[in-house]
């Protein structure tokens, strides 16, 4: 691709390298515009004689075609692609969803490609219609070899992103307190409602009990029979580890501990376990506050039926200082 200044009369079929404005300041033609005969007549009527343009050479693909070619390959799930002028593709969620991002692959592409990609954070909750990523090409054109290399990398490594829908998931909640389960319910229920409204989650299946091992075990078994997408244990006492009352109860119902302690503040004392494919979160004390905490970070992927690993919890430490 070679930019040059030529006579306006010779510019048909070439790409405008800079915007053109009328004398009064109103934009006449945008950068990247493909010139046609009508444009030439307009510019001549404005008294212009020369124009700065470029044209595609063999082995090059126009900026809009380049982002269009790759947009659907970087993501899977509930999304749509919107192409805008100037070599940009926006990816929008078509349903309420959780966005998962392969950070290593994203960095690799952004270091080596003639296209760059910006996304929302991994594990982000997105509402239908929200922009979750944008792709921008180098100005005017991209080498076909670059595009082919990017396509091959995505075919080998898979998409950079997933938009996993949250389709009215069922949530189970267990309120517990050493003295009275209803005391914990009164302490948490209003806050729980506000938190669930953020994610458009319907009214959960909820139980309350005294924080005593046998009662917690019975309550967990009862909630598990509903097959919820997620069970939250909201206790008036902060988790103390797998040997506390809730931790022992989790083991007795067959749940496997994934991780106790998370590098997120507020929320260091969260405990995550799985009973088969059902995640169970023993919420830390900060859950009593409406302010963002670790539970807000892990709820979207868990509600989208994504199994969070210990490694992924560890990765939350970068940016995990929320307050």
Name what the model sees in each region:
Residues 45-49, 72-79, 128-137, 197, ...:
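Generic secondary-structure signature for well-ordered alpha-helical cores
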Residues 1-145:
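Phosphate-interaction motifs
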Residues 31, 94-95, 135-138, 174-178, ...:
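Fold-independent oxyanion-binding glycine-rich loops
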């Amino acid at each position: 691709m070679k930019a040059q200044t030529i006579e306006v009369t010779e510019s048909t079929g070439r790409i405008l390298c800079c915007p053109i404005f009328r004398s009064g300041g109103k934009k006449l033609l945008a950068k990247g515009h493909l010139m046609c005969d009508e444009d030439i007549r307009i510019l001549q009527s404005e008294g212009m004689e020369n124009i700065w343009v470029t044209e595609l050479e063999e082995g090059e693909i126009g900026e809009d075609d380049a982002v269009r070619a790759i947009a659907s390959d970087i993501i899977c799930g509930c999304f749509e692609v919107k192409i805008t002028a100037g070599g940009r593709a926006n990816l929008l969620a078509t349903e309420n969803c959780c966005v998962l991002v392969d950070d290593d692959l994203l960095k690799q592409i952004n270091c080596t490609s003639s296209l760059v990609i910006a996304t929302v954070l991994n594990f982000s909750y997105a509402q239908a219609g929200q922009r979750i990523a944008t792709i921008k090409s180098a100005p005017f054109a991209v080498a076909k070899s670059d595009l082919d290399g990017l396509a091959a990398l995505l075919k080998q490594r898979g998409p950079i992103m997933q938009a996993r829908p949250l389709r009215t998931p069922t949530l189970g909640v267990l309120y517990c307190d050493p003295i009275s389960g209803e005391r914990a319910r009164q302490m948490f229920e209003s806050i729980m409602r506000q938190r669930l409204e953020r994610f458009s989650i319907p009214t959960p299946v909820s139980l309350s009990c005294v924080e005593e091992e046998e009662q917690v075990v019975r309550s967990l078994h009862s909630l598990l029979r509903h097959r919820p997408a997620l069970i939250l244990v909201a206790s008036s006492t902060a988790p103390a580890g797998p040997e506390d009352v809730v931790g022992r109860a989790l083991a007795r119902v067959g749940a496997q501990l994934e991780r106790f302690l998370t590098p997120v503040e507020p929320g260091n004392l969260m405990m995550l376990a799985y009973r088969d494919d059902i995640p169970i979160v023993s919420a830390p004390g900060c859950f009593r506050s409406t302010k963002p905490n670790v539970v807000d970070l892990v709820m979207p992927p868990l509600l989208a039926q994504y199994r969070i690993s210990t490694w992924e919890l560890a990765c939350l430490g970068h940016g995990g200082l929320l307050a």
